[in-house]
From Swiss-Prot:
It catalyses: isopentenyl diphosphate + 2 oxidized [2Fe-2S]-[ferredoxin] + H2O = (2E)-4-hydroxy-3-methylbut-2-enyl diphosphate + 2 reduced [2Fe-2S]-[ferredoxin] + 2 H(+); dimethylallyl diphosphate + 2 oxidized [2Fe-2S]-[ferredoxin] + H2O = (2E)-4-hydroxy-3-methylbut-2-enyl diphosphate + 2 reduced [2Fe-2S]-[ferredoxin] + 2 H(+). Dimethylallyl diphosphate binds at H41, H75, H129, S226, S227, N228, S270. This is 4-hydroxy-3-methylbut-2-enyl diphosphate reductase. Gene3D superfamilies: 3.40.50.11270, 4-hydroxy-3-methylbut-2-enyl diphosphate reductase, catalytic domain (3.40.1010.20). (2E)-4-hydroxy-3-methylbut-2-enyl diphosphate binds at H41, H75, H129, T167, S226, S227, N228, S270. Pathway: Isoprenoid biosynthesis; dimethylallyl diphosphate biosynthesis; dimethylallyl diphosphate from (2E)-4-hydroxy-3-methylbutenyl diphosphate: step 1/1; Isoprenoid biosynthesis; isopentenyl diphosphate biosynthesis via DXP pathway; isopentenyl diphosphate from 1-deoxy-D-xylulose 5-phosphate: step 6/6.
Amino acid sequence: MIEVEIDKDSGFCFGVVTAIESAERELGNTDTLYCLGDIVHNSLEVERLEHMGLHTIDHEGLSRLRDRKVLLRAHGEPPSTYALAKRNNITIIDATCPVVLRLQRKIHKCYQETRANNTQLVIYGKKGHAEVNGLVGQTEGTAIVIEKIEDLDRLDFTRAISLFSQTTKSLDGFKAVVAEIKQRMAEGVEFNYYDTICRQVANRLPNIKAFASSHDWVYFVAGRKSSNGKMLFEECRKANPNTLFISEVSEITEPLPEGVRRVGVCGATSTPKWLMEEVAVRIKELNASE
């Protein structure tokens, strides 16, 4: 008999929940609401909201809008987006995650205080990611984005450095970057670093590893665009090599291998609970005779 368990700690983080609730609330009062970028990196959840009247646009689309309501998702936006909205008489529904908002303010304050002494502001994050674009915008585009240790060659270790992190990055990865910078800094040169990783995200790492290792087989459910999903999946697979990444229920087409009894279903901070529940139902259907 197959036993299927959904990880109670997986699913939307509070920032994503707030953004989706904001969209649903607005769509309850209007037929059309625009969202700048995918509200969440999960295509099925985006489709659900689009059926309610949500229209996803990019920055070019925003520049053409006038006199409309636009939702800013949890990832946050640079100051230039707010300036454009004001010029175009766009009403902003700001669903920026409070953790991201605090980080934006912290980086902006650091930039204002250190720009005169030529300090390098460095962000450990994914280049081009919406959150990172918003953070870089707080420095008038001057921040240096570091994705991996090898990128540190771009820094000048004879000049002061202030290091921040994208909120959804790996804590271990951040610690490794800090250690490497410390080792390379010229003697007497100032290096300040700030652990700005969201603990709701960071705490999922040990939890999801424990969850994965306690099952014979794991389905990790996430959107292909989710950075958090990719990171958590890799950790899941390290803990349990029998971990499969899926984005939709339709990807489960075969019964489980013989001998599998305990199956886990987990996901990213952008994975809706309803999708994990559908995956669990599908697993039971395909393995009903096992």
